[in-house]
């Protein structure tokens, strides 16, 4: 009997079926396989770095834990975004924008439109996102709109018109915390006469010098003229500009000798350590003091305690005004824009703001967020201050100016403080107002919506 056996017919058929299945599977994988999942990583451009980093670090860690998306923070240090804004504009002009970036609500965003090849069409309209998370139901969300559209989702509310005072320095020299401009000038000159730096502002990162002039101007001119300055519709010969400049120079004369070399964190440090009496800044300084100087107790001017070291107050003459600085997120269009939108959505949500604002020194834009989440008495006080404020304006130094106008005034204010060249400053202000109005008119935008323009003011070009 032969040892060879023939292969049975069922086996042949079965093998053929298997072969066909394998071929079909290979063809399916080659031509019909599911698309590769997009990379779970985005870049977020920001100027929060160094001593101001804890808040954004906490937010990013929270977002990554929730979504699995890695966020690379490309930080360009410099207070108020002095350097970051122009780095972002350069990326946009080169056609390589990040997936998301930090921006202030207001005309600052329009500067990015103007720098982009297709203007606002290169950015994601976030109006629907704002509706979904409820931020457009808030007062802050509404005023962040540009002619009824939201391109920046707000993540917090800062107050710019604050003065920080070292209680020990004032007590040792028999000075009561000043509540009026006249009292501030008298106190500053008295301290200067004793060889004590009174007003400690910083020249290295430019912004706190213009910031001081701005608060003086707000106190002298009032909120309506301040808003007209923002739109460039204020007469450059208005007497309030000259009066604010005169007061500014009186206070600038009491700066420490090395003020041009200081940045804003160093200026805060001087006042905290008693090497100066006053520093005018926003409540991001509250976050800095809270995260860096653990043993330093802050208190509002209305409830000074014996153990208080730093008194925080509205800048004299601006008590009823909340000078807003609103940090926000913008999203350029691109292959990963959906991830950028998701990041902006989380950051601007109640959940994101509860993570970010406590260490930042700011407060949430949502009025129903309980004040007890804030670690400092100043933030709890600011919640009430905002609720009670009669007027709201947008800070000129922090978002209410187009970038080119902002740069003119930043450098002009430092030159004014150094050389007291008032004619040059008035010329700079005149040019700045003219350019500010021209850029607003060129774009046709205004803050708010047709139904609710910011502060009830519709500029002449409003469509």
List where the protein language model places each region:
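Glycine-centered hinge/linker elements that transmit conformational signals in sensory
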Residues: 188-190, 230-261, 315
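Hinge/lid segment of periplasmic solute-binding proteins
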Residues: 104-161, 176, 185, 212, ...
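C-terminal capping/gating helix-and-loop segments adjacent to ligand/active sites or protein-protein/ligand interfaces
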Residues: 228-230, 323, 362-365, 379-441
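Immediate post-signal peptide segment of exported/extracytoplasmic ligand-binding proteins
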Residues: 33-43, 64-66, 147-149, 171, ...
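Conserved N-terminal structural module of periplasmic/extracytoplasmic solute-binding proteins
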Residues: 3-19, 24-110, 130, 177, ...
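Short, solvent-exposed loop/beta-turn-alpha elements that line the ligand-binding surface or hinge
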Residues: 124-138, 142, 220-243, 293-310, ...
């Amino acid at each position: 009997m032969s040892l060879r056996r023939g292969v049975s017919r069922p086996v042949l058929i079965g093998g053929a079926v298997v072969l066909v299945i394998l071929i079909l599977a290979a063809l399916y994988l080659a031509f019909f396989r599911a698309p590769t999942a997009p990379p779970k990583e985005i870049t977020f451009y920001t100027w929060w770095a160094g001593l101001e980093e804890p808040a954004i670090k906490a937010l990013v860690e929270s977002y990554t834990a929730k979504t699995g998306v890695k966020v690379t923070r490309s930080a360009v240090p410099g207070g108020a975004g002095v350097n970051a804004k122009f780095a972002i504009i350069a990326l946009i002009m080169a056609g390589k924008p990040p997936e998301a970036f930090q921006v202030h609500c207001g005309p600052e965003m329009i500067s990015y439109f103007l720098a982009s090849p297709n203007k606002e069409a290169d950015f994601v309209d976030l109006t629907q996102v704002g509706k979904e998370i409820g931020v457009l139901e808030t007062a802050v969300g509404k005023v962040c709109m540009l002619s009824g559209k939201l391109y920046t989702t707000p993540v917090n509310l800062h107050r710019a018109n604050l003065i920080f005072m070292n209680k020990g320095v004032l007590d040792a020299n028999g000075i009561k915390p000043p509540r009026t401009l006249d009292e501030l000038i008298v106190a500053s000159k008295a301290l200067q006469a004793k060889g004590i730096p009174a007003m400690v502002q910083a020249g290295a990162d430019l912004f706190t010098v213009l910031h001081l002039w701005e608060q003086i101007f707000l106190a002298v001119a009032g909120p309506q003229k301040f808003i007209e300055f923002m739109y460039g519709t204020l007469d450059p010969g208005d007497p309030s500009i000259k009066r604010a400049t005169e007061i500014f120079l009186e206070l600038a004369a009491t700066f420490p000798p090395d003020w041009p070399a200081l940045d804003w964190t160093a200026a805060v440090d001087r006042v905290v350590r008693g090497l100066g009496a006053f520093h005018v800044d926003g409540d991001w300084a509250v976050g800095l003091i809270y995260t860096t100087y653990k043993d330093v107790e802050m208190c509002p001017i209305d409830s000074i305690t014996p153990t208080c070291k730093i008194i925080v107050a509205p800048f004299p003459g601006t008590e009823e005004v909340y000078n807003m600085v609103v940090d926000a997120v913008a999203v350029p269009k691109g292959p990963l824009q959906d991830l950028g939108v998701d990041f902006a959505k989380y950051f601007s949500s109640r959940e994101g703001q509860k993570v970010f604002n406590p260490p930042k020194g700011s407060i949430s834009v949502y009025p129903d967020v309980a004040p007890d989440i804030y670690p400092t008495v100043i933030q709890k006080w600011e919640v009430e201050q905002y609720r009670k404020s009669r007027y709201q304006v947008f800070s000129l130094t922090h978002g209410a100016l187009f970038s080119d106008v902002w740069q003119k005034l930043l450098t002009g204010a430092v030159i004014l403080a150094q050389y007291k060249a008032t004619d040059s400053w008035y010329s700079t202000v005149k040019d700045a107002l003219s350019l500010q109005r021209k850029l607003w008119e060129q774009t046709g935008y205004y803050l708010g919506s047709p139904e609710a323009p910011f502060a009830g003011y519709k500029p002449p070009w409003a469509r």
